Amino acid sequence: FKIVNVDSFHLYGNTGRDKRDVVNVEHIFNNWTPVTFSSSGTVQPADPNLLGAKTAMWADIADMGVTERDNYERLMRQAAVLSEKTWGGTDEDQTYEEYSLKFEKLKAGPGVELASDIPSETSLVLDYDFKNVKSGEDGTVVYDAAGNGYNGTVINADVKEEDGKNWLDLNGDGSLTTGLRSVDYPYTVQFDLKVDKKGDAQLFDGRDGRLSIGSDGKLKINRSYFEQKFDYTIPENKSVNVTIVGTQQVTKLYINGEFKQALTRTTNSETDYNHLLSTFVFPLTTIGNGFDGKIADLKVYDKALSPKTIKLAAEGKAVT
């Protein structure tokens, strides 16, 4: 009979579970070949009964906060290393570090829209300081100070100077559109926020999710059909600096440069619905929809800034 190698020990992923949530890609690269079977050793190379190999994912605990993006991130890495080891030959000189660089460069193929990488000249992807704007018939253009050309359009809102800053002044009917979809993790999104009137509003919205503020003044993320709330109340009529940091493991909130909370899964229990996975692809399509307040100094980085750097940025100091 013919065999396809889908070895459980090496090739099986189990998203969100304590047993191999993420397949050990480095171990596979360094120790596995298509003729390796964990339970029975190996077979001879070029054995005509061995047809090849597959990787597998058992993703059956969606209620724990697992989204299609979580599965995609894991499966993409599994499939890439399997392809390298199955079809890439046996180049003994290639190191895992070299393979990793090649993977990051190639990663997803053309037309794979789950990936949300934004081309940028530097790690600063987007910078709306609202200093350089131009009014027109179709709204006010806000120019991207990051130099990437991701200019935004303000509809039914104004840009005003207050407290030495230029603010996007929203009255509940206006918004800002960017022409972008989302920024993938790792990322850092930082902005100044002033709530004039509490109410449910979407601060950042798009196909991949939503960062909103509730009538209680608390920020919350919506991803797939999950809603997770940060336990911090944004004060009314007071400016605060908000920083959201997203990685493959966690979504963090900083206020005025100080760490407040991390949304993350802290238990392996499959019935704990209070601590969900919290990977959050940050939406950038529409800003301020339904919000009655002001936003200033919006910056988006395609990396997770360190706590020290976040503190400096919140104080208005230049960061790289």
At which residue positions do the language-model features occur?
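Flexible, acidic glycine-rich loops studded with aromatic residues
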Residues: 1-126
